[in-house]
Amino acid sequence: MRGTITIDGKKVEMEANAATPVFYRRRFHSDFLIEMQKLAEDLKLTGEIKNLEPIENLAYLMAWQPDPDNTPGAIEEWLAGFDPLSIYLASPEIFRFWNLSAGKTAELKKKRNGK
C-alpha cells in the first residue's frame, strides 16, 4: 500500500507491504512484530510510548520503500530532517498507515480463501 502522511508539516510518501517486516529485521536486527507487540502492550498499560525507536525505524522504512534512491541510507540522516519530537507526534498517523496496510493484506487473504 502506498500513501502520504504528514510528519513535521512535511508530506512523506510511504509504502508498507509484506516486505516491510523483512526489511525491518534485516536492517535493525530485531523482529518487527515483537517490537510492535511490545509497543501495543506499553500503550495499553500506561497510555504512553516508552520506546520511540521502533516507530522511528518503521517510519523510516516505510518512507524508504517507495524511493530508496532518494532516501538517505542512514536512518539518522533521515531523522535529522525533522524536529526532535516530530516522529513521536506523528506516531498515531504512522501506526494508522501500517494498520491500514496490514488490514488490506488480511482482507485480500480472506478473499483468496473464499471467506
Across the structure, where does each feature detected by a protein language model lie?
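Short linear motifs in exposed loops
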Residues: 15-17
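Charged interaction scaffolds used for protein-protein
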Residues: 1-11, 30-47, 65-115
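Short histidine
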Residues: 19-22, 26
